[in-house]
Amino acid sequence: MNKSRIEKVIIQSKSLNKEMSMLVYLPDGYDEAETFPTLYFMHGRSGNENFITHIDLNVVSDRLIEANRIRPMIIVCPNMDNSRGINSSLDCKEVLDPLNRTINIGMYEDYFINEVIPEIDKRYKTIRTRDGRYIGGASAGGYIALHNAFRHADLFSKIGGHIPAVELQLEDEDKAYFRHQGDWEKYDPITIAKEMTCTDFKVYLDAGDKDEGGFYEGCLILNNILKEKGIESQNHVFEGHHNVEYIKSNIEKYMLFYGN
């Protein structure tokens, strides 16, 4: 019987001035081994830390680890609210976007980089170098993963953007996150990639052929930029829409990327 487990970690964030939580998957054999690589996996716009079980990430990981198809690893799914994972406001608060939807603004990049990662490294038996630290995410979480990895290339060695919300321009519905065009460009994965000097990591991009956001276009452009820089990047267009079913149908492929 597999003895993996999921733990809930709650911290009082100084960056956001509120309590934040995350779920942490510990693989079978965690207590016996010395250290493990760590995958940070980011949820989408309407998700939270429960995304890890919502997409069966723990179940698929159990199966692949048991079959020796991937290396055992720690998986962390932090709650990032509906924030895009950026530093958008010194004051953490909820605001309405142009479509009257609630979004969260605050120092979310600082929260993840300066609080979540150090807390996980302190609590768990992680490999505390970039070679043993990976980041990925789906939809808005894919956007979070890409910009955090590109802006902090010294921290991560594998990066995954799965149906990532990579836009070709600042859309009206996203203007509540960004004060002006310059703020958008600061976090736009395509813009960052053009200026990036670090090339020592592996990147996995994918989107559905019927993705309602057309994010396969951004993935193609980003992949071409990365490959021109000599970065080991792969881009896939699989069958499907922009939904949870697409993620669940491809999660095994993602884990084979992170785990090998």
Regions from the language model: what does each represent?
Residues 1-260:
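Non-catalytic cap/lid and distal C-terminal segments of serine-dependent acyl enzymes
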